[in-house]
Every structure is written in structure tokens, then in C-alpha cells.
Amino acid sequence: MAMRTRLTWQQEKCLQNYFGGKRFCLLYKASVQKFSHQNLLCTCENQGPTMIVVYSEKCVIGMYLKEGFQGKDVSITIFALQETGFSLCAKGPDSPYLLFHKRKTNDFSILLDEKAVIVSSAICKMLQLTARNNVIPIQECEAFRCEELLDERKTRGIAVLHSNLLQALRDYKPYGDLVQQTRVLLLGPIGAGKSSFVNSVKSVFKGSITHQILVGCDEDGISDKYRTYSIKAKDDSDPLPFILCDSLGLGENAGLHTDDVWHILKGHTPDRYQFDSMKPITSNHPNYTHDPLLKDRIHCVVFVFDINSFEMHSSELVAKIKKIRRDLIKHGILHLALLTHVDSLDLITKEDMTDIYNYSPVKSKLEAFHGVFGFALSDILVVSNYVSEWQLDPVKDMLILSALKEILYTANEFLEDLPLNK
């Protein structure tokens, strides 16, 4: 029968995040392999980075050895997980072997044969522990090998997927050659990450981080013009066959006017048009496109939301967005939702992001978003935009490219469904 850790899912995620996104492989469990420091040390030698965890009645205490058990002094991080939170302190360099023996000079010892941890008053204070006579009884002890979450095999798989997605998007063609470039409109609340998504797509295809579009945290939004952005692949002078259209954010009483949405959709709004939230564009505007062609129209709409804040939008803004959705459905315009900042969800790790749609907290967020806005679960995409990074990350790239692929395929479905006279 396989051993199972006593760590809860939340405790494991907290430790993974703090210690650099590690996978914990259970090596030793005292209740199975006896409360014996000899058994523990024999199991843990030459295993690389190691974590020892003991369970008391009220908390979890442990130590992390980045260099593992070696015949030399190493740096040790002692930590405690309690209902009130996570606390830690650094110790050493010291011999990890000696921490399993009772010594007067030890300020922290794990005595397995006595089922107790000896903790000095100073460490108790730093870790906010309560110890009677500096002794904490323990019920269990476990040892883990700490592995990199993204092992070489998985890293190779991500690289292959990244390459395949890039090639698929380079080979993408609008349905039936009806247009040279499909147009995708990004709509959503102020600060949701619309402009950052455009920057992120540009960065992935360029092969380096770019911040061509100004982004920020202004409460009224940074984008105040209608902008159309073509994307170029690295070392390619020709733009790719799609255009990302950025707009002023939607607000409760301010932001993008709903009438402007329809002028954009129908292809009347020129690039660099300056929005006025109180006054939508009219046919009297000098650059108004009076007879737009199919190439000028929007072929797919993407509603962009911050995955951490969509549940906090006012009922007025939610109603406004739902009204736009109903009108899109009425006119047969296909649309998707894109949830940004998925990497900032509590306790998420890089490995979780490699299988993001099966990650339990993301699934819960998608269900919640479906409940608020009514999007089908299959129409909700998630990404992590490049906001403050200076280097590309293959896992982020994979999410961005996967989302873009779904968006462009949806645009093709719209073009395919057009009446012949369109």
C-alpha cells in the first residue's frame, strides 16, 4: 500500500510556493517505517533538497534543507504552518544529522524515539509556537525529496507544444480567404488586461518582451483611443493574418459608450479614434468609414476580465456587459471570455499552469464566472499576461498562444457562417 502524506492540499501548496515551486516526493513516514532517526537518515541520504515535517496536535513544524543531507554543515530553514499563517526562521550552517539528537547546544531538535520536538524559546517566539518546557509532542513525521516541478521531460513537452502552437498560428488563414486579416475586438472592464494581452501576443511572436502599448493602473484606464494592432513574427516583415483591436475599458457610468461598440463592430470606427465616453462617434466624424467592407468589421469579440476581481464588479457594470452579450448573440457575432492574471491565484505553481484547466481553483473560478456572466465553460479562456517581466516564460507563452489559437478559430467560424451575400 502506497504511503500518503498527512499534509493537506492547502498546506502543500503553501510550501510549494514558498520553496520555489517544488514537488514533494514522500520518502519516509514514521508511522509506517518506525519513529527512528536512523531509518529517516538512511532514507534521506543523497536525495538532494529535502524537507522534514512533523505534526503536532495544533500545527505543522518542519525544516527545509536546500542542500540535503550531506557530510557537511548546511543552511537550514525551520518553519511552522498554523491556522494563523506561515512563519519561518533561518538556522545554520549546521549539521542536519545532529538535529536528531538531544544536545544542549541545539536550539531545535527532532527526537523521533521520544515523539517530541525540542524548541528554544527564541525559535518559539520567531515561529509563534507554544511549547511547554520547550517541548512539543508530535504525532507523525514525514520526509520528502523536493523535486523541480517542471522536470526535463515536461520542459521538453512544453517546448514542443510551444513550437507547434507558433507554427499553427503562423500557418493560420482566415476562412475562405474572405479577408486578408481577421479582426478581433478586445472588450472588458477598465484595467482587466486588454492592452497587456496585445503586448503579450506581440512579445511571444517577437521572441522578446515588448511594451509597445502603454499599460498602467489609472482608474479611468490607459487606453483612450481605438487602436488596431497587426502582429509580426520574429524576422518576418509581413504581418500575421490577424489584427487585435484595443479599446477604452467598460465602466459603470464612464468608459466605452455602448453605441461606440456597435460602430466598431460594423467597421465604421477608424484607427486612432479618440473616444468620448459621453458622446459616441457619429457619421459626421471626418474619418468615419461610411461603407465598411467585411475586412473592416470585427470577426470575433473577446471579453477580457481579471480572474481575481470579476466577482467584485458592480451590478450595473455586469448588466451593461450582459446587455452587450445579448446583442452580440442576437446579431450572430461570436465571442469568448479571457480571464487574465491566472498566475496570481493563491497557491498556484508553475506546474499547475501547465494543466491550467484541470487546476481545481481555476475550475472553481470558471464556474463562478459562468454563474455571473453566463458564458459557456468552453468559451472561457485563461492567460497570464506579461506585465512586469523582462524575459519570456515558456509556460506563459503556451497559455497565450493556446488562447489566441481558440480566438482565431472562433473568428473563422464566424466567417464560415456568413451568408453568401455578405
UniProtKB/Swiss-Prot annotation:
Transmembrane segments: none annotated. Its main location: cytoplasm. InterPro entries: P-loop_NTPase, TLDc_dom. One of its GO terms (biological process) is cellular response to virus. One of its GO terms (cellular component) is cytoplasm. It is found in: Cytoplasm. Keywords: Cytoplasm. Residues 1-147 form the TLDc domain. The keyword Cytoplasm applies. Belongs to the IFI44 family. This protein aggregates to form microtubular structures. This is Interferon-induced protein 44. It comes from Mus musculus (Mouse). The gene is Ifi44.
